[in-house]
């Protein structure tokens, strides 16, 4: 009854107005699953590869080739398979692709099918996706990392770091956490406006003011937290996504906005000082993706008191994560389903992290859709943390709204991760 009888891929638009892949899967009993694939702006060199069309259509970013793969090769390979055999289906697609980075079929084609299959199987079983994937123990609502000021590749301003985030660690529920975030977001908007800054929002819903450096951004956020009636570090902690690969040149970190250059040791010391001065509890990609020595130095310096998250470093890849674990590098992994390209491999990366004592953070991409799958996956894996943008733009709030629904559905079983999500707090 859960055999796959139809797969339909189509080209839709993401939140940046670029094409992406959406997939529908239909089972023999009529169960249905739909998934849309996200896309990143700052991408790691070791990520799985999207299949794009090239040429003039959509300025080369069309995905008709990927859609053709879904409707042709992939359908032929898995039609008739049991949708509940997720591992087997994902492995069939990986083998069919045959490359190390999913460059033949395209990670966007494979992932769309992988997620849609899981959703169809969940519907067939009469379970919500988080329960189908995570089992009876899926009950932890994640602390959101809310990106409220943007810089780097996500903005046209002098700030070199890509994201400045707030984490409502002192809230008692996801519903309350979202309220904390919203109140700080709107307070920050007013303070920026009063100071003469533009308050338009960027790709992830955060503000992109013309501030001179990271400290100026952090000062605005700290003041806004206090003005909104919260205590920095107690009610709401701070986080950074440096996206350091984007400004790593010839072995150094080149801060064009600040007109400063820092070698890896100076970079680590700079981050350590920021963490100490501003209640920063998590730093993502503080070092470049292939600067393993720099990562090791940073981890040795502050890894016992600050969550150090590998995004471009690990690219949701269990093999790269195991390298990091062996070298004692970082202490957390960012989990992006499209970096690795299948649900099974995503779950494997989270499991690998947890077994090694690393934390895991479920994450969106800067190019998103209304698809809220990652909210369910955050609860399914009990990872305790989620990155899904600011408190604006429906492509971001869709995930928060889904978490609120899940919390309501779980009732007394629900537990908000709070401070325990970051093992060092």
UniProtKB/Swiss-Prot annotation:
Establish whether keyword Lipid metabolism is in the entry: no
Q: Which residues form the active site?
A: 204 (proton donor), 336 (proton acceptor)
Q: InterPro entries of this UniProt entry?
A: Enolase (IPR000941), Enolase-like_C_sf (IPR036849), Enolase-like_N (IPR029017), Enolase_C (IPR020810), Enolase_CS (IPR020809), Enolase_N (IPR020811)
Q: Which UniProt keywords apply?
A: Cytoplasm, Glycolysis, Lyase, Magnesium, Metal-binding, Secreted
Secretion signal span: none
Q: Which reaction does it catalyse?
A: (2R)-2-phosphoglycerate = phosphoenolpyruvate + H2O
Its GO biological process terms? glycolytic process
> Pathway of this protein?
Carbohydrate degradation; glycolysis; pyruvate from D-glyceraldehyde 3-phosphate: step 4/5
Any one GO cellular component localisation term in the record: phosphopyruvate hydratase complex
Its biological purpose is as follows:
Catalyzes the reversible conversion of 2-phosphoglycerate (2-PG) into phosphoenolpyruvate (PEP). It is essential for the degradation of carbohydrates via glycolysis.
Protein family (similarity comment): Belongs to the enolase family.
In its UniProt entry, what is this protein called? Enolase
Q: Which organism is it from?
A: Brucella suis (strain ATCC 23445 / NCTC 10510)
The major lineage groups are: Bacteria, Pseudomonadati, Pseudomonadota, Alphaproteobacteria, Hyphomicrobiales
The encoding gene: eno
């Amino acid at each position: 009854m859960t055999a796959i009888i139809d797969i339909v891929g189509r080209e839709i638009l993401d939140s940046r107005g670029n094409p992406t892949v959406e997939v529908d899967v239909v089972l023999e009993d009529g169960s249905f699953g739909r998934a849309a694939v996200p896309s990143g702006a700052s991408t790691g060199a070791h990520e799985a590869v999207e299949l794009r069309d090239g040429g003039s259509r959509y300025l080369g970013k069309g995905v008709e080739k990927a859609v053709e793969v879904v409707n042709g090769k992939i359908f032929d390979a898995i039609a008739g398979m049991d949708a509940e055999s997720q591992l087997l289906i994902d492995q069939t697609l990986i083998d069919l692709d045959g490359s190390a980075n999913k460059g033949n079929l395209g990670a966007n084609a494979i992932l769309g099918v992988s997620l849609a299959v899981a959703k169809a199987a969940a519907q067939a079983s009469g379970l919500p996706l988080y329960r189908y994937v995570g089992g009876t123990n899926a009950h932890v609502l994640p602390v959101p990392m809310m990106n409220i000021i943007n810089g780097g590749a996500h903005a046209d301003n002098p700030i070199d770091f890509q994201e400045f985030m707030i984490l409502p660690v002192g809230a008692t529920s996801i519903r309350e956490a979202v309220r904390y975030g919203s109140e700080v977001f709107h307070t920050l908007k007013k303070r920026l406006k009063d100071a003469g800054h533009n308050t338009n929002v960027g790709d992830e819903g955060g503000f992109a003011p013309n501030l001179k450096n990271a400290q100026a951004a952090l000062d605005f956020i700290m003041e806004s937290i206090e003005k909104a009636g919260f205590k920095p570090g107690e009610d709401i902690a701070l986080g950074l996504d440096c996206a350091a690969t984007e400004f790593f040149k010839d072995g150094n970190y080149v801060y064009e906005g600040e007109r400063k250059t820092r070698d890896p040791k100076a970079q680590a010391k700079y981050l350590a000082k920021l963490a100490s001065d501003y209640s920063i509890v998590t730093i993502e990609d503080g070092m470049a993706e292939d600067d393993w020595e720099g990562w090791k130095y940073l981890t040795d310096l502050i890894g016992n008191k600050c969550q150090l998250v590998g995004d471009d470093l690990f690219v949701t890849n269990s093999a790269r994560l195991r390298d990091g674990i062996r070298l004692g590098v970082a202490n957390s992994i960012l989990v992006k389903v499209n970096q690795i390209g299948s649900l099974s491999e995503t779950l494997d990366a989270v499991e690998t992290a947890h077994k090694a004592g690393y934390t895991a953070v479920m994450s969106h991409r800067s190019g998103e859709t209304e698809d809220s799958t990652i909210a369910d996956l955050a609860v399914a894996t009990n990872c305790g943390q989620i990155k899904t943008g600011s408190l604006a733009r429906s492509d971001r709030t869709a995930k928060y709204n889904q978490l609120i629904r899940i919390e309501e559905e779980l009732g007394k079983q629900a537990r908000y991760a709070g401070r325990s999500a970051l093992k060092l707090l």
